[in-house]
């Protein structure tokens, strides 16, 4: 049985609730904050991964490289896998990447694939759990190519670098990290990496919020990005570990 005060209290509660729900700033306090999502692209060897890692440290971000989303080639004989075009947009399972970014944007964890570059396959029965974070950085040569990906970004970066610099860096990386030979890296660069960069990667620079030079000092590239984020109000003072002149 309702007491004589309960109807009035119920009406007051309903009025206050409706007022609160109609107040976007107040309502925002109740909702989980969507992460700031940055897209970072550039040709292979341009320096984009180095920049992405430094920005990840500066912004306490989660880094999501496109490299983990290469399609698994376990259905092909090993001798055929190395001849696939890994620089074409179809080589990546970009629909899964979009799904994972959307889930992280909704503050849900994901199970990210683990890719083995020596066998060109995904490691079976193994994933890495990636938890949501206030800042998410999506990095890869084609990070600015796919329209569904670009639609998720709040800010995007393109790293520009000359072909010869890119090739030399790619040789050094693939020999050290991916168990390849210099001959195979040069052959792939001429056959697919450079042609695909001309077709898909370099044109995607037009979608970038800011372009930095991969031959510049790393701290200057980081400074340019952080300054632009500040100017756009996407990063608050004190939100990163470095210093930016205001």
Describe each region flagged by the PLM.
Residues 2-30, 131-132, 172-175, 194-246:
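NTP-dependent small-molecule kinase module
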Residues 38-39:
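Short hydrophobic/aromatic beta-strand immediately N-terminal to the Walker A/P-loop
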Residues 44:
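The conserved Walker
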Residues 48:
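Conserved lysine of the Walker
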Residues 51, 55:
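Hydrophobic positions on the alpha1 helix immediately C-terminal to the Walker A/P-loop
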Residues 57-65:
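Post-Walker A helix-loop "phosphate-sensing" segment adjacent to the P-loop in P-loop NTPases
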Residues 62-63, 71, 75-119:
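Conserved nucleotide-sensing/catalytic segment adjacent to the nucleotide-binding pocket
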Residues 123-176:
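ATP-dependent NMP and nucleoside kinases share a basic, alpha-helical "lid"
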């Amino acid at each position: 049985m309702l007491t004589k005060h309960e109807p009035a209290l119920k009406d007051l509660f309903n009025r206050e609730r409706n007022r609160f729900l109609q107040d976007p700033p107040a309502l925002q306090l109740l909702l989980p904050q969507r992460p700031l999502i940055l897209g970072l692209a550039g040709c292979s060897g341009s320096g984009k991964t180095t920049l992405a890692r430094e920005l990840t440290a500066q912004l306490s971000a989660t880094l999501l490289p496109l490299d983990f989303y290469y399609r698994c080639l376990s259905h092909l004989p090993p001798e055929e896998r190395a001849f696939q075009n890994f620089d074409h947009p179809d080589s990546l399972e970009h629909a899964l990447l979009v799904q994972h970014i959307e889930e992280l944007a909704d503050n849900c964890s994901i199970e990210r694939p683990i890719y083995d570059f020596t066998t060109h396959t995904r490691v079976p029965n193994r994933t890495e759990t990636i938890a949501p974070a206030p800042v998410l950085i999506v990095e890869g040569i084609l990070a600015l190519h796919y329209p569904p990906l670009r639609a998720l970004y709040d800010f995007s970066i393109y790293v520009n670098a000359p072909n010869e610099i890119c090739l030399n860096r790619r040789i050094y990386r693939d020999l050290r990290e991916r168990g390849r030979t210099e001959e195979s890296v040069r052959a792939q660069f001429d056959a697919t990496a450079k042609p695909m960069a001309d077709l898909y990667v370099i044109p995607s620079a037009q979608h970038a919020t800011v372009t930095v030079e991969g031959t510049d000092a790393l701290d200057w590239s980081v400074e340019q990005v952080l300054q632009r984020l500040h100017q756009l109000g996407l990063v608050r003072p004190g939100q990163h570990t470095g210093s930016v002149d205001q």
